[in-house]
């Protein structure tokens, strides 16, 4: 893809059809900056928000409540740029995966800075993504490419 925005839009609209709901927090890049997926004339998706802790991590009870509302996709950002660059620990991702599986919905990860997170955490990028059904990462963030995302 030419950009992370397009990569995320393709993922969101692959998992959801027009008018379906996506569970995410209101600070995520996918919502704050890439809003077109939520415009009626483009993606037509409806945002449902979960809350973050003071540390910038998803509040599990808030996610569980959102999943009960009939959403079709759980969207996460890892690392979460607008939450201070917080890295979502595997323990948190595993709990979120369990909740999503119970609800029968996929997880999309906006991993724009995935490889930065891998280096900082000492984890393999595939391990960080292991609980997601789809992942977008930018080749222009820490990998030296002038633009592009996968």
Language model feature labels by segment:
Residues 2-150:
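Conserved PLP-enzyme active-site core in the AAT-like
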């Amino acid at each position: 893809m030419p950009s992370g925005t397009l990569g995320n839009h393709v993922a969101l609209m692959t998992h959801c059809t027009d008018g379906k709901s996506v569970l995410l927090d209101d600070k995520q890049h996918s919502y704050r900056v890439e809003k077109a997926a939520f415009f009626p004339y483009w993606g037509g998706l409806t945002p449902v928000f979960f809350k973050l802790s003071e540390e910038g991590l998803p509040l599990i009870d808030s996610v569980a409540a959102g999943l009960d509302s009939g959403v079709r996709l759980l969207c996460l950002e890892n690392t979460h740029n607008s939450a201070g660059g917080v890295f979502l620990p595997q323990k948190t991702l595993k709990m979120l995966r369990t909740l999503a599986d119970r609800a029968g919905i996929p997880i999309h990860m906006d991993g724009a800075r995935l490889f930065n997170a891998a280096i900082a955490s000492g984890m393999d990028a595939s391990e960080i993504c292991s609980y997601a059904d789809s992942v977008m990462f930018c080749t222009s963030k820490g990998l030296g490419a002038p633009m592009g995302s996968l």
